[in-house]
Amino acid sequence: MHLNTSICEVDNPDLTEEREKGTFDTDKMAAVIYGSEKLARRRREISEAVSKIPELADTQPFPFMDRLEKITEGSRKLEVLNNNIRDIIDYDDNGERLHIYQEVTGMEGHPLALHEVMFIPALVSQASKEQQEKWLGRARRREIIGCYAQTEMGHGTNLRKLETTATYFPDTQEFVLNTPTTTALKWWPGALGKSSNYAVVVVDMIIKGKSYGPHPFMVQLRDEKTHIPLKGIVVGDIGPKMSFNGGDNGFLGFDKFRVPRTNLLMRHVRVEADGTYVKPPHAKVNHSAMVHVRSHMATGQGALLAQALIIAVRYSAVRRQGFLENKTQEVKVLDYQTQQHRLFPSLARAYAFIFTGFETIHLYSQLLKDVDMGNTSGMADLHALTSGLKSVVTHQTGEGIEQARMACGGHGYSMASYISEIYGIAIGGCTYEGENMVMLLQLARYLVKSVELIKSGEAKKLGPMVSYLAAKGGHPDLSSLNGYVTAFEHMARRQAWKATEKFLKLMESGESREIAWNKSTVELTRASRLHTRLFIIEAFMRRVSRIEDIPVKEVLTDLLHLHVNYELLDVATYALEFMSSTQLDYIRDQLYLYLEKIRPSAVSLVDSFQISDMQLRSVLGRRDGNVYENLFKWAKSSPLNKSDVLPSVDKYLMPMMEKAKL
């Protein structure tokens, strides 16, 4: 029995050679990645079950389809899946449900994507028990299809300035929804354009002439029998995008559209029949749907980065180019140190992001329980943390995927690699659910408040995630991982204090708070990034420390060492005032050492994500490594190759050439 369970006899021998170098069981590594042996095994079982249903296979490669074909193909597969899904998965298990959708439809989006990821979670976190009894069961059974509509054409991150209104009329106990301007149109929500017949819509709630800010409403958009938009609803598709073109992101407008008072989601707030407003226990409790998505983004982005690295690492193991010592056979591209430096730090980040995501998801689940018990003390901590993570993780994921594409050379530019599609999907995360710079500044506000508490002698009030800001700095001992944490704490602490002092001094000089803040934002965002990267390192360390399987723990410890050395070098300018050049040279040498240590395990590390070829959709990243013959096969399937002479050539180019001969 091979340690790497991906080995098969028909594979490219170069890839088999790499897999035989592995020192750990890839199934056991998968158990660490996905949380347990049972969860990892269920993923494999689901993938295998899906592979046995031929109707769920793509009718042609996705890159050769236009938008309508992609949406139609996604809907066709969902209909087939709906007839089989309860025989394959436990439908009440969110993880199994998400995995089977990814397996069947890939990552380009489908009509139920936001239904599962945003609509249902919004009902779970925002609707009262009575409202859940009315709508949640129908949503889970897919009697209705919903989405989450918050972003507007003119406003996204600044929720306080949302223009769509819901005005309450006590005499009829109804809210009237209205879109007063073009910029007030809801814009971008996935599945809104053509698929959803319901939406959780976030609007500015007005009662007796007073604005109460953004609140979520359950709104029916289309007739359940005909799917025609209801009177007073303007809804449609916003057109092609950089990616996600298997989905129908849409626009939505209201013209004096009435909904019952009880359509306001009332788990945390309430409006009485007479218009009395009962406010939530915490100012940001209505943001829980956003916090939910941001809590999962680290894991989701880590998975996207992992897919790009599966492709790039496998391809680098079968692609031969140039010579080293052996002049008779070209060397594997993966043997070049530059290729390792390009890919392995991103591989470490993929693991780090996934492990960090586990922590934030656990914190979010605990927060929901606490809020139900009336305890909202953890809301500010988690809101700040997930804001920073959302920004740092999406940005670094985009960087890593682009490096993976370039590491594949010219073929990486082809849609046959599928990396460009992964990139387009991943970098969407830099702007949806909050623009990244704004997210960093939300965390920065929390850091500034924390520093101000310390300055006022109230350090005891600090949350656990920022307690290090009150600690005394020291010189790091780089002989242990804790020494790297000490170094990162010092840099993050120093930058947080530096940015806060700059902000406060500007106000002392006479600048208004707003202007002083704006003039400090570059330093503040730097503080947020350092704080977030520190948390990721600590989350990675905590996860590795709990692993029981020795071979798995050893290779992940090597990956962790690679991660901390790379991360520290990446921000070395912040370390110049307290670390010597000798220490920085040591870190650089350690980085190169761990590149060499990871090299034999690289293919097994990416195989451990256990992403099927069906989901990966990459010719370059095929499990069997038989790239070149399948690249030729893929190219021949291009619709342009259905005829030897294109109509455009016959109609325009041939006459042009004939005319030139006269």
Curated annotation (Swiss-Prot):
InterPro entries the UniProt entry points to: ACOX_C_alpha1 (IPR055060), Acyl-CoA_ox_N (IPR029320), Acyl-CoA_Oxase/DH_mid-dom_sf (IPR046373), Acyl-CoA_oxidase (IPR012258), Acyl-CoA_oxidase_C (IPR002655), AcylCo_DH-like_C (IPR036250), AcylCoA_DH/ox_N_sf (IPR037069), AcylCoA_DH/oxidase_NM_dom_sf (IPR009100)
Catalytic residues identified in the record: E433 (proton acceptor)
Ligand binding (substrate): K284, V285, N286, H287, R294, Y432, E433
Broad class of the protein's primary localization: other
Cofactor(s) named in the record: FAD
Coiled-coil ranges from the UniProt annotation: none
Official protein name in the record: Acyl-coenzyme A oxidase acox-1.4
Organism whose genome encodes this protein: Caenorhabditis elegans
Protein encoded by which gene: acox-1.4
